[in-house]
């Protein structure tokens, strides 16, 4: 955060290969679903493929019933939440999935500028990784969480999906 936050134990170098979220890193040993998906594009595409089909290659990992349990809305009044996944649901995630994604599209985004999107209708997987947080802080005194990368077109994740659905 450009040196705006300083206290004992806070990581100050550019973070690679570890969760960026401080709560997850320090309190949860770096493992928690709320902090995003952390890997490379190839491995995230494999995970997305498993979520699309229940398997990868010759291996089956989940039955259709388990897949449905993962991706079904978890509350009647919140069609945009699955189990560990965001759902397009009631068009409340268009800033991530664009305006044309079907309601059963699922995915996960991350604060650092990542998007994994799975559209079962189009048999489509999107893995989009940016480094918007690895940019200077715009104004350390005003807001140490406002990075220059937030203003880049690439950090507006929904535009990727929007472009894919254009005819």
Regions found by a protein language model. Name each.
Residues 110-112:
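Short, small/polar residue-rich loop motifs at catalytic or cofactor-binding pockets
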Residues 116-117, 123-131, 136:
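Short, well-ordered beta-strand elements
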Residues 1-103:
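Short, surface-exposed loop or secondary-structure junction motifs
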Residues 53-56, 65-66, 71-79, 90-93, ...:
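Short, gly/Ser/Thr-rich active-site loops of penicillin-recognizing serine hydrolases
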Residues 83, 114-116:
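Residue-level detector of beta-strand structural context in well-folded domains
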Residues 97-98, 129-130, 138-141:
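Short conserved micro-motifs at the rims of enzyme active sites and ligand-binding pockets
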Residues 107:
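Short, structured beta-strand/loop micro-motifs enriched in basic residues and often containing a Trp
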Residues 41-45, 120-121, 154-158, 162:
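A structural signal for well-ordered alpha-helical segments within the folded catalytic domains
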